[in-house]
Amino acid sequence: MDPQTQNTSLQRLQNVENRVVKVLELAGGVMEELASPSGPKKEFVNSHCREFMQSMKDIQVTLREEIKSACEYRPFEKCDYNARIANEICFQKLEYVLTQLEDLKQTADRYPSSD
């Protein structure tokens, strides 16, 4: 991988890291809203959950592209173990987050709308 490509790749991964932080802030905002003494505002929770889900999908796509591009520059043709393992770990983590988010959505849907 030439230095220019590597630098660009690192910048894209830095952007992903920033998006992950934003996603965690969204999740924290939803948790605070759910804990609100006056009850959660359904529209607030729904919009933040939608944004969370879209961001997670975007992050997953970006990470897959980065893993694929890293594999294209690998020195040994069949040496993709690290990339495959990293991809599998990320995939499992995203599945877990999506499951938790679905549970959160179901919980939020049980509360009456306070609009």
Swiss-Prot record:
Its main location: nucleus. It comes from Arabidopsis thaliana (Mouse-ear cress). The gene is MED11. GO terms for molecular function: transcription coregulator activity. This is Mediator of RNA polymerase II transcription subunit 11. Keywords: Nucleus, Transcription, Transcription regulation. One of its GO terms (biological process) is regulation of transcription by RNA polymerase II. Component of the Mediator complex. It is found in: Nucleus. Belongs to the Mediator complex subunit 11 family. One of its GO terms (cellular component) is mediator complex. Component of the Mediator complex, a coactivator involved in the regulated transcription of nearly all RNA polymerase II-dependent genes. Mediator functions as a bridge to convey information from gene-specific regulatory proteins to the basal RNA polymerase II transcription machinery. The Mediator complex, having a compact conformation in its free form, is recruited to promoters by direct interactions with regulatory proteins and serves for the assembly of a functional pre-initiation complex with RNA polymerase II and the general transcription factors. Disulfide bonds: none annotated.
